[in-house]
From Swiss-Prot:
Taxonomic path: Bacteria, Pseudomonadati, Pseudomonadota, Gammaproteobacteria, Enterobacterales
Origin: domain of life: Bacteria
Task of the protein: Involved in zinc efflux across the cytoplasmic membrane, thus reducing zinc accumulation in the cytoplasm and rendering bacteria more resistant to zinc. It may contribute to zinc homeostasis at low concentrations of zinc.
One cellular-component annotation, GO: plasma membrane
Name used for this protein in its record: Zinc transporter ZitB
Main location: membrane
Gene that specifies this protein: zitB
Family: Belongs to the cation diffusion facilitator (CDF) transporter (TC 2.A.4) family. SLC30A subfamily.
Length: 312
């Protein structure tokens, strides 16, 4: 029986994540104040809704920035993966906050629909256009140069996207009010934008919960991986006890492999590691090699045979 443990060179997030979050926070916080003033002066719910989104975004971006900074801390004997999971926790909290604030806006919009209030369409238009430009800039900052599926940055970008959609909705509502004077357009557009934001927030919430519960990445088919490994490396007769979860942005795996006793243990382990790295981008894997068939009630819960042996 043999064990192997391989690591990626670094689990630390890229510095550009922190820079993008900081710039986006400055832009979002600044224009949030502008929209609060504009919403109060114009009486527009769409602007106030967008300002509410931006307030949540500013807090979310700050939380995300702190999470990235904490995640840079090196591993310790107590926190052996460092603080990488904190970014996933931040994404979860951000998603919850976005769902709550959006539901509150929908509730207020429904009340506004039945009791319309006067809205200054021209001022609303000016502020909405300025907010749209700010959101476009912040959204571009968060996506520029990003080549990793960081849930934390994704959560922050989702908040900004909600504001971007809110600004578009406010512009459309302002145009309708200016041309027709029909003020219910303001809460109606707020509800339509909120529905779009809720859909994306729910998806993010599911992904972050899956990571917090140490579920396997949605994009990874464990059964297919087991069959692929047994097929590509003939010495591997059986793969079982496979566990995969995410720590920050990196997948982590443990597995047991029943193998034909090799002449060179290290060479076989290296081939398995290379396979996992190049085929599935798993750089952190703990592999236990076994020479006997797996016995016990847990073996068949996660087991694939290459066809070399039969199990009873």
């Amino acid at each position: 029986m043999a064990h192997s443990h391989s690591h990626a060179d670094s689990h630390l997030p890229k510095d550009n994540n922190a820079r993008r979050l900081l710039f986006a926070f400055i832009v979002t916080a600044g224009f949030m104040l502008l929209e609060v003033v504009g919403g109060i002066l114009s009486g527009s719910l769409a602007l106030l809704a967008d300002a509410g989104h931006m307030l949540t975004d500013a807090a979310a971006l700050l939380f995300a920035l702190l999470a990235v900074q904490f995640s840079r801390r090196p591993p310790t004997v107590r926190h052996t993966f460092g603080w990488l999971r904190l970014t996933t926790l931040a994404a979860f909290v951000n998603a919850i906050a976005l769902v709550v604030i959006t539901l509150l806006i929908v509730w207020e919009a429904i009340e506004r629909f039945y009791t319309p209030r006067p809205v200054a369409g021209n001022l609303m238009m000016v502020i909405a256009v300025a907010g749209l430009l700010a959101n476009l800039f912040a959204f571009w900052i968060l996506h520029r140069g990003s080549d990793e599926k960081n849930l934390n940055v994704r959560a922050a970008a989702l908040h900004v996207m909600g504001d971007l959609l809110g600004s578009v909705g406010a512009i459309v509502a302002a145009l309708i009010i200016i041309w027709t004077g029909w003020t219910p357009a303001d809460p109606i557009l707020s509800i339509l934008v909120s529905v779009l934001v809720l859909r994306s927030a729910w998806r993010l919430l599911k992904d972050s919960v899956n990571e917090l519960l140490e579920g396997a990445p949605v994009s990874l088919d464990i059964n297919a991986l087991q069959r692929h490994l047994s097929r590509e490396i003939p010495e591997v007769r059986n793969v079982h006890h496979v566990h995969v979860w995410m720590v920050g942005e990196k997948p982590v795996m443990t597995l047991h492999a029943q193998v034909i006793p090799p002449h060179d243990h290290d060479a076989l382990l290296e081939r398995i590691q290379d396979f996992l790295m190049h085929e599935y981008h798993i750089a952190h894997a703990t592999i236990q090699m076994e020479y006997q068939v797996c016995h016990g009630p847990d073996c068949h819960l996660n087991q694939t045979s290459s066809g070399h042996v039969h199990h009873h």
